[in-house]
């Protein structure tokens, strides 16, 4: 098992260096849906992400807030393959300090998002916070098939 600080810094570093991730959520008819996401940012191990306000996923996540976010870099070698899976509950943010913090973090990470903020387009944007409950960190450099699971709450 990895040391507490080692896995934490490895996971934060890996997520920070990931350009696109995959959001997993369950639709009302219990079908699992996956969506590529480029607008996300970490706050500790919790995660903010944005979407078009009218996107069907916004309504579906409000109904069933249990979601996952999968991070995997392109062009990896199998011997050193890594990925991170974040599992938690998503909450729609609309106002307040946490909402403002999310906008700042998303703007710092994503120039396109920052541009939308500058143009006053936030009225068309939904901002979510995932309260991370579990992290799965796959790291084949520690042995083929090595997946460490960490419960956060």
Kindly give the residue locations of the regions a language model identified.
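Extreme N-terminal tail/first-helix region
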Residues: 1-21, 148-150
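Charged, gly/pro-rich active-site loop segments
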Residues: 2-3, 82-153
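Alpha-helix boundary recognition
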Residues: 15-16, 62, 107
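Generic structural signal for secondary-structure transition and capping sites
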Residues: 19-20, 66, 111, 135
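Short beta-strand segments
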Residues: 19-53, 61, 67-73, 81-84
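Activation segment
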Residues: 51, 58-59, 94, 139
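A generic "binding-loop/recognition-motif" signal
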Residues: 53-54, 133
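Short, surface-exposed beta-strand-loop junctions and turns on beta-sheet-rich folds
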Residues: 55-57, 76, 143-145
């Amino acid at each position: 098992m990895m040391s507490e600080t080692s896995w934490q810094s490895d996971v934060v570093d890996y997520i920070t260096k990931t350009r696109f991730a995959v959001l997993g959520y369950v639709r009302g008819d219990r079908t699992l849906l996956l969506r590529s996401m480029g607008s996300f940012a970490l706050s500790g191990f919790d995660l903010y992400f944005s979407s078009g306000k009218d996107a069907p996923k916004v309504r579906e996540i409000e109904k069933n807030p249990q979601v996952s976010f999968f991070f995997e870099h392109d062009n990896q070698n199998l011997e050193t393959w890594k990925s991170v899976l974040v599992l938690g509950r998503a909450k729609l943010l609309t106002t307040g300090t946490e909402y403002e913090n999310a906008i700042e973090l998303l703007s710092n990470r994503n120039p396109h998002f920052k541009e939308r903020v500058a143009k006053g387009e936030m009225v068309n944007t939904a901002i979510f916070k995932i309260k991370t409950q579990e992290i799965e960190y796959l790291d084949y450099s520690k042995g083929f098939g090595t997946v460490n699971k960490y419960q956060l709450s």
